[in-house]
């Protein structure tokens, strides 16, 4: 009987030791998560967001703060060692991603699912006149249409696109009216400009030289249709397979002389007639404000690659 009593005491003591060890493990896991939260909060307070190289990309602090808030939720609502450990891993990864999102030189690669959404085309006042200027480089030519920028919606809108190995500019004036370049090469940068003037026609330029023009009627647009770069808003298979940089939209028609001078794409954001300009030469994440400071776009599934050496 005495032996049985001693065994029961030993078993109870062992259970207390095990529980004590578990409490200690929980405490260590919880302390680790608290330290990680403090590290994340310090990262936010001591960093600077901005559009200059070396800054943290705009929007990064909000993303990290969301992870911090979630970690606090775990602290306040869980007593599980496993939950603390998982939260620590996720927050630690978020801190690493935060610092990896430093603004640096980059080139946006567009592909299936990629887009740069400029919002409703009705906000851009393009029915009287406009110009589009950009640089493009293709890593693949597709048999169908590849939209550089488009607000095509049924039988309305306009599009700067490639079809096969030529670039085309089309508007809908009741019918589709357009012009195109000669054949392009893969893996080479081209400067492209397209203009529209109500009653004055359309024109297309390649590397500063006019390569096509056509008379046209009045442009028809659906005001609430999205203006998107890298794809067509209404057709997911009409996506760009390559790179876009130095995208600018103008309220007026750029003259042949201006287009030739635009090749360097060195716009300050204060030029007369300039609606918006995105250099797209720095990895600024998924939300980018243009040089005028008036327009912010959202990028989806765009891959930022290192610039060419």
Q: Language-model features: where?
A:
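Bacterial Sec-dependent N-terminal signal peptides
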Residues: 2-8, 13-47, 95-107
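Amphipathic, non-membrane alpha-helical rod segments
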Residues: 40-98
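Extracytoplasmic low-complexity segments
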Residues: 99-112, 122, 263-309
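Extracellular glycan-recognition modules
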Residues: 103-168, 201, 253-258, 272
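Extracellular, beta-strand-rich glycan-interacting domains
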Residues: 130-140, 238-264, 275-285
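Short, aromatic/His-centered strand-loop micro-motif at the edge of beta-sheets
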Residues: 169-191, 234
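Short tryptophan-centered beta-strand motifs in secreted/extracellular beta-sheet-rich domains
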Residues: 187-196, 204, 248
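Flexible glycan-contacting loops in extracellular carbohydrate-active proteins
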Residues: 214-243, 269-275
């Amino acid at each position: 009987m005495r032996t049985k009593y001693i065994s029961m005491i030993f078993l109870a003591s062992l259970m207390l030791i095990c529980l004590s060890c578990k409490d200690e493990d929980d405490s260590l896991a919880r302390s680790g998560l608290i330290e990680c939260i403090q590290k994340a909060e310090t990262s936010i307070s001591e960093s600077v967001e901005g559009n200059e190289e070396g800054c943290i990309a705009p929007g990064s602090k909000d993303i990290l703060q969301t992870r911090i808030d979630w970690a606090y939720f775990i602290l306040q609502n869980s007593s599980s060692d496993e939950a603390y450990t998982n939260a620590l891993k996720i927050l630690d990864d978020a801190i690493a991603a935060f610092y990896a999102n430093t603004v640096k030189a980059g080139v946006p690669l567009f592909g299936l699912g990629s887009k740069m959404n400029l919002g409703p085309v009705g906000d851009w006042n393009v029915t009287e006149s406009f110009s589009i200027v950009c640089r493009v480089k293709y890593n693949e030519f597709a048999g169908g249409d590849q939209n550089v920028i488009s607000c095509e919606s049924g039988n309305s809108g306009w599009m700067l696109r490639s079809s096969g190995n030529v670039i085309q500019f089309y508007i809908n004036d009741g019918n589709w009216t357009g012009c195109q370049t000669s054949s392009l090469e893969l893996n080479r940068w081209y400067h492209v400009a397209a203009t529209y003037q109500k009653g004055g026609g359309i024109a297309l330029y390649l590397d500063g030289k006019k390569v096509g023009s056509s008379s046209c009627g009045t442009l028809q647009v659906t005001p609430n249709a999205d203006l998107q770069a890298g794809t067509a808003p209404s057709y997911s298979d009409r996506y760009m397979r390559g790179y876009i940089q130095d995208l600018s939209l103008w309220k007026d028609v750029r003259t042949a002389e201006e287009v030739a001078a635009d090749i360097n794409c060195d716009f300050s954001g204060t030029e007369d007639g300039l609606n918006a300009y995105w250099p797209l030469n720095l990895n600024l994440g998924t939300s980018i404000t243009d040089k005028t400071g008036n327009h912010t776009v959202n990028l989806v599934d765009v891959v930022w690659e290192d610039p060419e050496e």
